[in-house]
């Protein structure tokens, strides 16, 4: 007889600093209400993301009915990568009036290549357009 498939009870999406997951909020309460071993998740997440220190790494945690879990790490949010490349703290409050920085097409291509697995795009050109649009909506000029 084949083994039974585990039943999924919850899918939790969090954004946590790489290598710095702790049982404190937001991680503890989100996992605790589903009965997941919080320390075990923190250890596994920190080990999986230690090479990306300094970035915020989104994670999708799948919780099963026997309280076990699996997780998938995603690429850092596009907005964070854009801000890092532009060298600014935050985007513009009025993006179409005040421009806060400028990105080259080479920088946009680099960010698009990083984000491609998580974007809803099949080609690098389409991914570049998505990233460029995000940058423009943050008040960052995209050009040569």
Swiss-Prot record:
Protein name as it appears in the record: Large ribosomal subunit protein uL11
Record carries keyword RNA-binding: yes
Family stated for the protein in its record: Belongs to the universal ribosomal protein uL11 family.
Organism lineage string: Bacteria, Bacillati, Actinomycetota, Actinomycetes, Frankiales
Entry-linked SUPFAM superfamilies: Ribosomal L11/L12e N-terminal domain, Ribosomal protein L11, C-terminal domain
Gene3D superfamilies associated with the record: Ribosomal protein L11, C-terminal domain, Ribosomal protein L11/L12, N-terminal domain
Post-translational modification: One or more lysine residues are methylated.
UniProt record, GO biological process: translation
Any GO CC annotation of this UniProt entry: cytosolic large ribosomal subunit
Source superkingdom: Bacteria
Keywords of the record: Methylation, Ribonucleoprotein, Ribosomal protein, RNA-binding, rRNA-binding
Function comment: Forms part of the ribosomal stalk which helps the ribosome interact with GTP-bound translation factors.
SMART domains referenced in this protein's UniProt entry, alphabetically: RL11
GO MF annotation list: large ribosomal subunit rRNA binding; structural constituent of ribosome
InterPro entries: Ribosomal_uL11, Ribosomal_uL11_bac-typ, Ribosomal_uL11_C, Ribosomal_uL11_C_sf, Ribosomal_uL11_CS, Ribosomal_uL11_N, Ribosomal_uL11_N_sf
Listed Pfam families: Ribosomal_L11, Ribosomal_L11_N
Subunit structure: Part of the ribosomal stalk of the 50S ribosomal subunit. Interacts with L10 and the large rRNA to form the base of the stalk. L10 forms an elongated spine to which L12 dimers bind in a sequential fashion forming a multimeric L10(L12)X complex.
């Amino acid at each position: 007889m084949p083994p039974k498939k585990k039943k999924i009870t919850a899918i939790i999406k969090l954004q946590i600093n790489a290598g710095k997951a702790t049982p404190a909020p937001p991680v503890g309460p989100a996992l605790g209400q589903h009965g997941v071993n919080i320390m075990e998740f923190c250890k596994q997440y920190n080990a999986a993301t230690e090479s990306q220190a300094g970035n915020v790494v989104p994670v999708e945690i799948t919780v099963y009915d026997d309280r076990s879990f699996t997780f998938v790490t995603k690429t850092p949010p596009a907005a964070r990568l854009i801000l890092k490349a532009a060298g600014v703290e935050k985007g513009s409050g009025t993006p179409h009036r005040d421009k806060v920085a400028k990105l080259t097409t080479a920088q946009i291509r680099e960010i698009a290549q990083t984000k491609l697995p998580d974007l809803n795009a099949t080609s690098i050109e389409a991914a570049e357009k998505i990233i460029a649009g995000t940058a423009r909506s943050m008040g960052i000029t995209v050009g040569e």
